Design a protein with these regions (language model features):
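Residues at secondary-structure transition points
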Residues: 1, 5, 75-79, 83, ...
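HTH-adjacent hinge/linker in prokaryotic transcriptional regulators
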Residues: 2-5, 9, 15-23, 28, ...
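Conserved phosphate- and dinucleotide-binding cores of soluble alpha/beta proteins
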Residues: 11-12, 22, 45, 51, ...
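Key DNA-contact positions within bacterial/archaeal DNA-binding proteins
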Residues: 23, 33-34
Length: 249
């Protein structure tokens, strides 16, 4: 077994068990004690697990309950967001009925969309304005306006989503976790994300690597409930997942 394959297997075992001993890994991977210890040292140095006496434990997830405002988020990881946004926009085909979630990466998508035969629904005023400026047909959800993320949220928005059946949808997330799925800091926004996902055939979450192994206050979908579009991913446990697309260009 190649080194990278062992790394991925070790991290996968840790994700499911939370902790593992050297002896268990020797059995699971059919590898020597020296090989396992060397692998654990390397993964610990990379910050992918925490090495303890006799084995390893899952590296503590980063928890976040704070929502940064849109202005501060727009310039974070902008190159990565542009790559992700361009690839995501290319998934939209003529005739698609698309849900576009509020967020800085979903907003960047709009500049790359070429199919004017697609119809859009969004909970972001800025997205609706830009889509209309570019000549797209767009519907804006009604409800409570959340100033921090500039999103329409709450029960009225959820009720408005009941009548829609989307072919494709694109969402942002504050946290992406194998165990806790996709999460966001605020309940009212999570409600809208959850309902729109439930009414969508193909779901895509747009997330740069900084969102991985992060957990926010409210989970709105399980990890397997969407395809993740990212770029520059270095985490083996996610790289081997069939629902993760790592954009190369």
């Amino acid at each position: 077994m190649l080194t990278e394959e062992r790394f991925a297997k070790i991290l996968s075992i840790l994700e499911s068990m939370g902790s593992v001993t050297v002896q268990q890994l020797m059995t699971e991977l059919n590898a020597s004690e020296s090989t396992i210890r060397r692998d654990l040292n390397a993964l610990d140095a990379n910050g992918q697990l925490t090495k303890v006496h006799g084995g390893a434990i899952l590296k503590t997830m980063a928890y976040s309950t704070k929502d940064d405002n849109v202005v501060s988020r727009k310039e974070k990881n902008r190159d990565a967001k542009n790559k992700i946004a361009k690839y995501a926009a290319e998934q939209i085909a003529p005739g698609d009925f698309v849900y576009l979630d509020a967020g800085t990466t979903t907003e960047l998508m709009i500049e790359y969309i070429t199919s004017h035969q697609a119809v859009f629904v969004t909970n972001a005023i800025s997205h609706a304005k830009r889509l209309a400026e570019r000549g797209f047909t767009v519907y804006l959800l009604g409800g409570e306006f959340k100033a921090v993320t500039e999103a329409i949220v709450g029960e009225e928005a959820v009720a408005a989503l009941e009548k829609y059946n989307f072919t494709k949808g694109f969402w942002g997330a504050n946290g992406v976790s194998l165990q806790k799925g996709y999460s966001t800091p605020e309940l009212k926004e999570a409600m809208v994300k959850k309902k729109s996902m439930e009414n969508c055939k193909e779901c895509f979450v747009l997330a740069d690597e900084s969102k991985f192994n992060q957990i926010s206050s409210v989970t709105f979908a399980p990890f397997e409930g969407a395809t993740v579009i990212t770029t520059g991913l270095s985490l083996p446990a996610y790289k081997k997942c069939n629902n993760v697309i790592d954009v190369k260009q």
